[in-house]
């Protein structure tokens, strides 16, 4: 499984940097949610869009018990001053606390550690479900 995670490391970096370059404030994560949904759908994941406005819920497995794994995707109203190629392109908004990495980590979990060995259901959901 570690080998599989390493094999997609470069793609995960591309996704995280894309999320970092295009941060969106809470309840406005339309681009981020669309991108997350697009990636999940490419891997055949059943999902629900627009949960709590811009949330995404990925359904993995079936039955009971149900485990929900939440991943934040909102950014903060801060100006990024980092001088990196993937700096925020949205003035006054940036990912300053790691939320740009939460969904790529969830994607690693989905792609490298399938829910097939789990006797129930595992949902990955966005931060809107806590609000």
Feature-to-residue mapping (PLM):
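Acidic/His- and Gly-rich active-site-bordering loop/insert found
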Residues: 2-95, 104, 112-123
